[in-house]
């Protein structure tokens, strides 16, 4: 249940720091958050899909690592990002 090309492009355009920026922590966290939210809906209908659940846990861990990195580098960008995404960290 991956994001479509249009959804990815919209998220990248919304969170990029400069034109063509796809690697900044903000963009990566926003893409992971969108994937995680999409998978949560999948698990409501498919409770026994343990293989995909492993992928979900991996995405959550990767997002946590990126957020920890951003918090250490620039706390104002970190605070702004979790506010925009509605995360509860």
Curated annotation (Swiss-Prot):
Keywords assigned by UniProt, alphabetized: Ribonucleoprotein, Ribosomal protein, RNA-binding, rRNA-binding
Any one GO MF annotation of this record: rRNA binding
Protein name per Swiss-Prot or TrEMBL: Small ribosomal subunit protein uS15
InterPro entries, alphabetized: Ribosomal_uS15, Ribosomal_uS15_bac-type, uS15_NS1_RNA-bd_sf
Pfam families attached to this UniProt entry: Ribosomal_S15
Organism of provenance: Pseudomonas entomophila (strain L48)
The UniProt record lists the keyword RNA-binding: yes
Similarity comment: family membership: Belongs to the universal ribosomal protein uS15 family.
Domain of life: Bacteria
């Amino acid at each position: 249940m991956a994001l479509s090309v249009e959804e990815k492009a919209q998220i990248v355009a919304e969170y990029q720091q400069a034109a063509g920026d796809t690697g900044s922590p903000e963009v990566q966290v926003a893409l992971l958050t969108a994937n995680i939210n999409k998978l949560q809906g999948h698990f409501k209908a498919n409770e026994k899909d343990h293989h995909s659940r492993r992928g979900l846990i991996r995405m959550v861990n990767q997002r946590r690592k990126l957020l920890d990195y951003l918090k250490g580098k620039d706390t104002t960008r970190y605070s702004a990002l979790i506010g925009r995404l509605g995360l509860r960290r």
